[in-house]
Amino acid sequence: GDGTRVQILHALEQSEMCVCDLAALLGMTKSAISHQLKALRLANLVTFRREAQIVYYSLADEHVKEIIDMGIEHLYE
């Protein structure tokens, strides 16, 4: 759910990643990660590029990164 999407956004803040990398990092199935990425794409928070058979995801723009940073900062206040 929401917590997973936050984890995905935080991971993508570090670097562009494919579904398999995110699944391994978060200990989830590729199917579950794909489902969450679809929601993030529909919200215009992430973008993707295809390289052969692999799709790489990244944050949509610098504004998304700033929002994530503010949210994480707020959690630790």
Located regions from the model:
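Residues at the C-terminal ends
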Residues: 14, 42-43
